[in-house]
């Protein structure tokens, strides 16, 4: 009996130690590159940092803080107001980050393969998200800040759980494969959008509703290919955007502004599609008479 009691006491003690190890740390870094000398508990699961950080500091966070779940960098300044390239690449423990308040760019691969990252707070100052920034993250909803103009190639590629994106009003470009194989069901683009890159929404197989904005100029190769639930779409532009013969493959019906159907049908590759003058009906029914058509 005494052995059992001793064993239970040891187990409870270990459990309490594990609970205690879940700690929050606050650190101020006056000079970039000094974070490693200021963090006293590298096993903490939560940290708030203020001051100045550089690539070496983010390497330390990535490689030397094995339990980190929450990271608040809202009061941090980084060189050039750019979150460093591959800064937290494959930091698989990370679940939430608050980005620096004055950040303008998130660098290539900054959070790629952060497979448990669910929550990102973006600053109002953000202008550019670069290549593969959030590749294969676990985001389910993203609200992008008002000043954002450019979403880079593969920025949210294979974020399989991403169901909703709130696009900002100044967005001009969505890069190649930016939202490829995401789980979006509906997309509402801002009027400012001009280009949608190749494969941008490729294999978004839950996508059912898309409205293309008035200033859109280009929808590139395979941008909406393999979106087999997207049977129809609406365009606000009176001038047909440039497309290719493989931009769409399941989407066959397009509703365009009244009086512009002929112009669309005369444009390259649009003549192969069904163009309908006027507003999108509340209910769309598409009948397939032959398999594969």
Label for each model-derived stretch:
Residues 1-24:
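Bacterial Sec-dependent N-terminal signal peptides
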């Amino acid at each position: 009996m005494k052995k059992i009691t001793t064993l239970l006491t040891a187990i409870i003690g270990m459990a309490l130690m594990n609970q205690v190890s879940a700690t929050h740390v606050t650190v101020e870094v006056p000079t970039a590159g000094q974070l490693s000398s200021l963090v006293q508990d590298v096993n903490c699961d939560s940290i708030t940092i203020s001051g100045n950080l550089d690539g070496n500091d983010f390497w330390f966070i990535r490689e030397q803080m094995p339990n980190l779940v929450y990271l608040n960098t809202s009061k941090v300044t980084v060189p050039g107001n750019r979150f460093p390239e591959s800064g937290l690449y494959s930091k698989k423990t990370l679940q939430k980050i608050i980005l620096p308040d004055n950040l303008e760019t998130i660098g290539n691969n900054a959070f790629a393969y952060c497979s448990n990252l669910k929550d990102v707070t973006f600053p109002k100052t953000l202008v550019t998200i670069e290549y593969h920034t959030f590749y294969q993250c676990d985001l389910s909803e993203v609200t992008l800040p008002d000043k954002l103009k450019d979403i880079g190639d593969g920025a949210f590629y294979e974020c399989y759980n991403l169901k909703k994106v709130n696009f900002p009003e100044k967005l001009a470009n969505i890069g190649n494969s930016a939202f490829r194989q995401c789980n979006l069901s509906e997309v509402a683009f801002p009027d400012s959008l001009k280009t949608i890159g190749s494969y941008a929404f490729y294999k978004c197989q839950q996508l059912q509703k898309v409205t293309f904005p008035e200033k859109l100029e280009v929808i590139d190769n395979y941008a909406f290919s393999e979106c087999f639930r997207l049977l129809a779409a609406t365009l606000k532009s009176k001038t047909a955007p440039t497309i290719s013969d493989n931009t769409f493959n399941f989407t066959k019906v397009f509703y365009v502004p009244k009086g512009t159907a002929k112009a669309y049908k005369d444009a390259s590759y649009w003549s192969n599609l069904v163009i309908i003058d006027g507003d999108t009906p509340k209910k769309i029914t598409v009948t397939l008479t032959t398999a594969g058509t």
